[in-house]
């Protein structure tokens, strides 16, 4: 766990949950697993605060617990899961593009609340969608339920592990913490709910003022019927989203390298194997040419012969994204996911080198990568770059850890005159170094955004107050002159300052998302490589 990762986790926890949760979370990230009382002692927080903070972190899957043989419960932070909070906007946007506004709000609610029952999600989303609709229109619960079922069928949401049913006749004491389990076949099983109803609008403030005083909310009594899915909680399946992001990156890479038809064939193959292939598998399941032809999108008019030519072309490509696994069924083909991730990571490294050091350094990097091991003289000759410039460029990349130097001595004394000095590229090491820098970059972006917001806090508060007054006056049917007077409460220089702030914050937000795309590619490649070793 690097300092850059810990700092980024700290910023994310503080932004999402506040100071107390951040304090407990970062303490667990630094120290590893600890029991409750040790956490309270080390952080100087009250036992009640620690319990509440752990409850929040466990509910959002950011902390897990283990029960030891002696019955001691220890809590452990999931740093990698904390870092996934960076990707929340991307998860939500992806769901919007695939399943529309309803799917977007379902995933948003699950991410914001950690875990929820299906009935609670459906009601909340229906209410939110009804709020945005025109007067007189409402969102039906059944429509939201159908969107939820589609998300579960494609594994974007999954059930949370449950407390197993205990035998009431068992005389032994209950365990200090429940051991949650779930059967794999039940993970995407949607409970049969007959949710009948429509979304409700919140009463506006003027209605409350004109009408009767608000009735007190009735307390839940024991006689109140529980919902049919009571105790069945759902969460977002982040691995499935990562699988989708990886597939999109591969399709985009094939489109850039070859053409749109090739990318559509690869997209079809990935879509056919997305449920059957585990998220960390190095290859997809073998697919026959006939199966691929039958599964091509409707209206995509290419003949079987043309498809076979494309598949042969893809299989013969030096990048080896597609491999041939047999000749049955017109030819069996697989997508080499590990090779694809390695190529995407290498392309990312090349792009970074070109941006930082120029095209000549990128040429040397590609050359060393292709030839595996090269002496300085060979680099000069192959790259056709003068000796002095080549030496400077190699040193720059060596000092930044993009390339490494390997010594091969001719004699045991390692004398420089009798030693070969070979330049080589360790892609895994370079990817780790770049990933570390990406974490630093995102932490800097978050800090900058927080600074910009803090500097203009008073102006933002004033703007929000003016907007609230405008909204309430428009609702009561105020005249145009009155509205204009309220608008003029914010002066022209203040309005310009607000525009600049908005533009800067939008740039910083966009930069965060773009850096996270690089983080995703590098993390996927490192994870895939570690599984193969």
UniProtKB/Swiss-Prot annotation:
Gene Ontology MF annotations: single-stranded DNA binding
Any Pfam family the entry gives: HTH_9
Bias kind Basic and acidic residues: ranges: 211-222
Phosphoserine modified-residue sites: 194
GO cellular component: nucleoplasm; RNA polymerase III complex
Subcellular location: Nucleus
GO biological process: defense response to virus; DNA-templated transcription; innate immune response; positive regulation of innate immune response; positive regulation of interferon-beta production
Highest rank taxon of the organism: Eukaryota
InterPro entries, A to Z: POLR3C_WHD (IPR055207), RNA_pol_III_RPC82-rel_HTH (IPR013197), RNA_pol_III_Rpc82_C (IPR008806), RPC3 (IPR039748), WH-like_DNA-bd_sf (IPR036388)
Ranges where the record places region Disordered: 161-183, 197-228
Keywords noted in UniProt: Antiviral defense, DNA-binding, DNA-directed RNA polymerase, Immunity, Innate immunity, Nucleus, Phosphoprotein, Transcription
Protein family membership: Belongs to the eukaryotic RPC3/POLR3C RNA polymerase subunit family.
Biological role stated in the UniProt entry: DNA-dependent RNA polymerase catalyzes the transcription of DNA into RNA using the four ribonucleoside triphosphates as substrates. Specific peripheric component of RNA polymerase III (Pol III) which synthesizes small non-coding RNAs including 5S rRNA, snRNAs, tRNAs and miRNAs from at least 500 distinct genomic loci. Part of POLR3C/RPC3-POLR3F/RPC6-POLR3G/RPC7 heterotrimer, coordinates the dynamics of Pol III stalk and clamp modules during the transition from apo to elongation state. Pol III plays a key role in sensing and limiting infection by intracellular bacteria and DNA viruses.
Self-association and partners: Component of the RNA polymerase III complex consisting of 17 subunits: a ten-subunit horseshoe-shaped catalytic core composed of POLR3A/RPC1, POLR3B/RPC2, POLR1C/RPAC1, POLR1D/RPAC2, POLR3K/RPC10, POLR2E/RPABC1, POLR2F/RPABC2, POLR2H/RPABC3, POLR2K/RPABC4 and POLR2L/RPABC5; a mobile stalk composed of two subunits POLR3H/RPC8 and CRCP/RPC9, protruding from the core and functioning primarily in transcription initiation; and additional subunits homologous to general transcription factors of the RNA polymerase II machinery, POLR3C/RPC3-POLR3F/RPC6-POLR3G/RPC7 heterotrimer required for transcription initiation and POLR3D/RPC4-POLR3E/RPC5 heterodimer involved in both transcription initiation and termination.
Protein name listed in UniProt: DNA-directed RNA polymerase III subunit RPC3
Organism: Rattus norvegicus
């Amino acid at each position: 766990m690097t300092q850059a990762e810990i700092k980024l986790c700290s910023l994310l926890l503080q932004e999402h949950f506040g100071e107390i949760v951040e304090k407990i979370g970062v303490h667990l990230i630094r120290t590893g697993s600890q029991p409750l009382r040790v956490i309270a002692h080390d952080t100087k927080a009250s036992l009640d605060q620690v319990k509440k903070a752990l409850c929040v972190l466990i509910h959002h899957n950011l902390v897990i617990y283990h029960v030891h043989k002696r019955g001691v419960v220890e809590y452990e932070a999931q740093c990698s899961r904390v870092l996934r909070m960076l990707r929340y906007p991307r998860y939500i946007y992806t769901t919007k593009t695939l399943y529309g506004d309803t799917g977007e709000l379902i995933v948003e609610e699950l991410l914001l609340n950690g875990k929820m029952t299906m009935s609670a999600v459906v009601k909340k989303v229906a209410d939110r969608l009804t709020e945005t609709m025109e007067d007189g229109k409402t969102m039906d619960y059944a429509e939201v339920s159908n969107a939820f079922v589609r998300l579960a069928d494609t594994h974007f949401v999954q059930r949370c592990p449950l407390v197993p049913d205990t035998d009431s006749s068992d005389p032994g004491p209950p365990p200090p913490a429940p051991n949650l389990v779930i059967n794999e076949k039940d993970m995407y099983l949607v409970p049969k709910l007959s949710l009948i109803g429509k979304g409700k609008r919140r009463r506006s403030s003027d209605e409350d003022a004109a009408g009767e005083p608000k009735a007190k909310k009735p307390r839940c009594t024991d006689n109140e019927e529980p919902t049919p899915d009571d105790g069945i909680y759902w969460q977002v399946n982040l691995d499935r989203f990562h699988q989708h992001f990886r597939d999109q990156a591969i399709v985009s890479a094939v489109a850039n390298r070859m053409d749109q038809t090739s990318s559509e064939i690869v997209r079809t193959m990935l879509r056919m194997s997305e449920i059957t292939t585990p998220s960390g598998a190095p290859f997809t399941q073998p697919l026959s040419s006939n199966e691929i032809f039958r599964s091509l999108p409707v209206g995509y008019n290419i003949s079987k012969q043309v498809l076979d030519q494309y598949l042969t072309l893809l299989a013969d490509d030096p990048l080896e994204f597609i491999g041939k696994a047999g000749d049955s069924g017109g030819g069996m083909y697989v997508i080499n996911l590990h090779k694809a991730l390695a190529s995407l990571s290498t392309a990312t490294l090349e792009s970074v080198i070109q941006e930082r050091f120029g095209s000549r350094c990128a040429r040397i990097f590609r050359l060393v990568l292709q030839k595996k091991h090269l002496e300085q003289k060979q680099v000069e000759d192959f790259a056709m770059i003068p000796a002095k410039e080549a030496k400077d460029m190699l040193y720059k990349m060596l000092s930044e850890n993009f390339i490494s130097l390997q010594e091969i001595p001719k004699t045991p004394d390692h004398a420089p005159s009798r030693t070969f000095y070979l330049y080589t590229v360790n892609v895994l090491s370079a990817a780790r170094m770049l990933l570390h820098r990406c974490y630093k970059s995102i932490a800097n972006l978050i800090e900058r955004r927080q600074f910009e917001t803090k500097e203009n806090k008073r102006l933002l508060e004033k703007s929000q107050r003016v907007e609230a007054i405008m909204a309430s006056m428009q609702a009561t049917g105020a005249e145009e002159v009155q509205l204009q007077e309220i608008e003029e409460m914010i002066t022209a220089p203040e309005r310009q300052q607000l525009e600049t702030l908005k533009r800067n914050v939008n740039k910083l937000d966009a930069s965060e998302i773009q850096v996270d795309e690089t983080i995703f590619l590098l993390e996927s490649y490192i994870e895939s490589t570690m599984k193969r070793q």
